[in-house]
Amino acid sequence: METFYTTCRIENVVNRRQGTTIRRLLVDSGSEYSWIPSPALERIGVGREKKDVPFVMANGEQITRNVGFAIIRFDKFFTVDEVVFAEKGDSALLGARSLEGLNLRVDSRRKKLVAAGPLLAA
């Protein structure tokens, strides 16, 4: 699958006026979590709720990162999700859990996010 980038707004879950726009988020449905640059999360007051969470990178390297909670907005869609405090050298990613929470799917042919349709009730 070819990759593409999107823009999302990230907001503090307690004070939605504290927010920032991330302009180059790699859409990565192979990554479970969304990775947001630490300085951006710190600037809007997102707390580090889970510390030293272990992750295995695509190359097999094992690392730890902190995780917090944020509102993620794309167009008219929004969700509350766990976000990883990405460090220098980490990619900024919009991951599968956020895509599911936003009820969006990847249109790889057109390289864009589209509404996933009605939610399953059962």
Explain the meaning of each model-derived region.
Residues 1-122:
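Pepsin/retropepsin-fold aspartyl endopeptidases
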